[in-house]
A protein has these predicted regions:
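Intrinsically disordered, low-complexity Ser/Thr- and acidic-rich flexible linkers and loops
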Residues: 25-31
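A short acidic/basic microdomain associated with nuclease active sites
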Residues: 1-5, 72
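Nucleic-acid nuclease catalytic cores
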Residues: 49-54, 67-105
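Catalytic core segments in nucleotide and nucleic-acid processing enzymes
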Residues: 46-47, 58-61
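Conserved catalytic cores of phosphodiester-cleaving nucleases, focusing on short active-site segments
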Residues: 12-23, 37-50
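Ligand-binding face of N-terminal immunoglobulin V-set domains in extracellular IgSF glycoproteins
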Residues: 64
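Non-catalytic C-terminal interaction segments of nucleic acid-processing enzymes
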Residues: 89-174
């Protein structure tokens, strides 16, 4: 979409709840505090990052992902040049969007080159706009809320990406 909505929709979103990492009483106590354990992530996915496209790709990720606790620019092929990598590191440090090098053959082999700067609070205005414009995102938030309240991840409620992330990424790279 052109205009005001062009760079608002991330390619992929995710969340983290420490249900398997924390004791039940800690999870309950956390729910009483202002420091919520739920974390939202946003990802902009590209086939490659080169000298020709990195600025546009990075600032698209800034625009699409700054609403979340952490935002990332993800690419399979990232130019391996010291000067180029230093520039990516500078951008990540300055604007807070991290860089992930994706290994589509082995998702677990992917690595964070430069971590995102975590945000304490979410950009609620942008989240509201995303929900108004994107039914899938609105449903995603509803499902996360249900999981948070029930203290159980209902994996069947999430889209096909979680079922076969490698296939989703390969399709996205076409």
């Amino acid at each position: 979409k052109g205009g005001y909505n062009e760079w608002i929709h991330p390619d992929m979103v995710g969340f983290y709840l420490p249900l398997d990492d924390w004791r039940p009483n800690v999870i309950e106590f956390n729910r009483l505090s202002d420091n919520n354990s739920l974390r939202l992530f946003s990802f902009e996915i590209k086939k490659a990052l080169t000298k020709a496209n990195y600025r546009e790709a990075y600032f698209q990720a800034v625009s699409n992902s700054s609403w979340a606790h952490e935002g990332y620019l993800v690419a399979v092929d990232i130019l391996q040049n010291d000067e180029f990598l230093a520039e990516l590191e500078r951008l990540a440090s300055s604007f807070g969007i991290g860089i992930i090098q994706l290994d589509p053959a082995d998702i677990d082999g992917s690595r964070i080159l430069y971590p995102a700067r975590g945000r304490v609070s979410l950009d609620w205005e942008t989240i509201n706009k995303l929900c108004e414009q994107n039914r899938d995102f609105d449903k995603f938030l509803q499902d996360v809320k249900i999981d948070y309240e029930s203290k159980r991840i209902h994996r069947t409620e999430f889209d096909e990406v979680s079922k076969d992330i490698a296939k989703y990424i390969k399709d996205k790279m076409k």
